[in-house]
C-alpha cells in the first residue's frame, strides 16, 4: 500500500494497494470533491460520496445539487396540549433529514380545563411548509385517551404553515375534536405519537 498524488482533470490524493484503492479527489466537472474507491484491479474507480461546495453531499455517481443531502439535525422540543395547565410527561424528540422532519411525542397532562377548543398538540420543532404535502402522526400508545368508539375515527393532521397537530374526527377528517368532547377521556391520560412532515424552507 502506498500514498499517491495525481493531477489529471483535478487533484487526487489516495492510498493504493495491489487490489484496492481509496482516494479523495477534486474534480474539474463539479464544484466539490469526491471520496471514491476501486474494489479490485479489474474494476473502475467509482465515487462513493461527493461533498458539494454549494452545500450538501451526494452519493454514488450523482452530483446534482437538487439531490444533495444538505441538512441533518437531531434535537428535543417541548410539546404542549391545548387546555392543559400542568404535565406529568411532556417529551419531544425529532430528527430532520433533508426536507423531512420525523418526531416522537409523549405527553400527559396532570391538570386541565377542557373546553370547546380543538384538541391540539402545539410546539412542533419547525413550522410546516406552505404546500399540499401535508404531514401527520399516528398513535402508538394511548392510555384511555379516547373511548373505544371514538378512537378508530381520530386522525392527527398537520396543516400548512403550522406547528400543531390537530385531532380530527370522521372518515373525511373534517370535524375537529373538542377537548371537552364526551367521546374522549380526561386530558390527564397519556398519549404517544410518531409522525413526520415537510418543514418550511426545507
Roles of regions detected by a PLM:
Residues 1-71, 113-115, 131, 171-173, ...:
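Trimeric beta-solenoid/beta-helix "fiber body" segments of extracellular/virion adhesins
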Residues 4-5, 24-26, 49, 91-95, ...:
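Short, exposed beta-strand/loop patches in secreted or surface proteins that constitute
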Residues 7-20, 36-44, 73-89, 137-151:
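Short, solvent-exposed secondary-structure boundary motifs
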Residues 40, 52, 60-64, 87-91, ...:
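Extracellular jelly-roll beta-sandwich "head" domains, especially the C-terminal globular C1q domain
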